[in-house]
Amino acid sequence: MRPVSDFDRIASNIAIWHGYDSAVKAELYSTCLGTSGGNYLIDPIPLESEALSELVGSKSVAGIIVTNCNHHRASAEFAEKFSAPLFGRTEAFPNKAEPDLKRVADGDKIYDELTAIDIEGAVEGEIALNYAPDDGTFIIGDALINFEPYGFTFLPAKYCSNGKQMRRSLRKLLAFKAKRMLFSHGTPILSDASERLRSLLDGSL
């Protein structure tokens, strides 16, 4: 897909960028988290060089995080460009061994207050992330979406390996507090994210 020309900063240390990929006929969203240990790029799609330089700024890129087996996108290119390791579940890389892959498991801390949560029953290798600073932020792979005509809801059942199991797994997120929720597919939720998630999960019982 073509490189995106710009990004949106939604907090001092959080930015997103997005673009349409005709190959999958979907709008794809990517996230940059700025930590004291460097930037983490999550499910990155291509970004024009000038915008990328502005996004990264003076900080190093500490890692590229892949949230499931379908979200490799430009991760390999970014990892090579910045000499940064890839982070993800082993199941997210089923077809090849990545020499610089740092495997993550449920509850692992990728960095300080950045935690990975396994989401079983969604797409193979699915994780969600919780970034605790500034009232908390969830970053979701495919298990939750927020775009029309669906709105904020679960990944449609036809794309899940086990929808009921996915809903149970998503309840693990309720152990964390998050003001914001960012998606790989959909518009960010910028307030009351934990409450919105609880309402969605309770309504699915």
Name every feature range the model reports, one short phrase each.
Residues 1-5, 21-38, 89-98:
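An N-terminal domain-start capping segment
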Residues 19, 23-63:
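Pre-active-site segment of Zn-dependent metallo-hydrolases
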Residues 48-89:
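Active-site metal-binding motif and surrounding structural segment of the metallo-beta-lactamase
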Residues 48-49, 69-74, 93-96, 145-147, ...:
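Active-site environment of divalent metal-dependent phosphoester hydrolases
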